[in-house]
Design a protein with these regions (language model features):
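Selective transmembrane helix interface/packing segments
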Residues: 2-201
Length: 201
């Protein structure tokens, strides 16, 4: 067995665990930004899981433009730690939004730029997945409410609202969510590769 026999599973575990926590922190930032229902049970879980490190960071990092800057800094720090650990495991290349990012070949400054790309990719993905969930729910069980649906509606509202103003429902069908998914996918394709290219210099 080669050295990769244990390295690849370990890298997978590290990436999964780090990404899950980054997702929670970024979700907290987005939900605060959108003034989501704090008493929602999912919101409560996210708050409980992310409060301890944010409490520490907020002592040094003030809010900017009314937003929780500490949450963004925490995300970047965790992503950076993830990349450093993957470098230690001798993982030369990872994929960020399906774009190869040679984390083993760039400077630590380049890694920081990759962190921004990874965070931007996750940010877009959250809105994209929320739109997909909304489409699926509208087909399977429209009209039913649960805590997850409440948060999904909160996340998708600022994207769907301007589209719905310009594209009203036609024949009883609302195509705004499909348009939003298309825009988000194209946006991801256009935004992430240049950031990764910048970090690769």
């Amino acid at each position: 067995m080669g050295s990769n026999y244990f390295t690849s599973p370990l890298a997978f575990i590290i990436t999964t665990l780090f990404d899950l926590y980054i997702l929670l922190v970024l979700l907290r930032f987005i939900l605060q930004m959108l003034r989501a229902d704090f008493y929602n049970t999912v919101s409560q879980f996210i708050v409980k899981m992310t409060t301890p490190p944010l409490k520490v960071l907020r002592r040094f990092i003030p809010s900017m433009l009314g937003q929780d800057s500490a949450a963004i800094v925490l995300c970047l720090l965790i992503i950076y730690a993830k990349f450093v650990l993957l470098r230690v495991l001798d993982i030369p290349v990872i994929a960020i939004a399906d774009v190869p990012a040679p984390i083993g070949l760039v400077s630590y400054a380049g890694l920081l730029i990759y962190c921004i790309a990874d965070l931007a990719s996750l940010f877009i993905s959250i809105f994209l997945v929320a739109c997909i969930i909304q489409v699926v729910i509208s087909w399977i069980n429209p009209g039913q409410y649960n805590p997850i649906i409440g948060l999904v509606n909160t996340i998708t509202a600022p994207i769907l609202r301007p589209i719905q103003k310009r594209l009203p429902a036609m024949g009883g069908f609302d195509f705004s969510t499909m348009v939003a998914i298309l825009v988000l996918m194209v946006g991801k394709m256009l935004i992430i590769p240049p950031i990764i290219q910048l970090g690769s210099f």
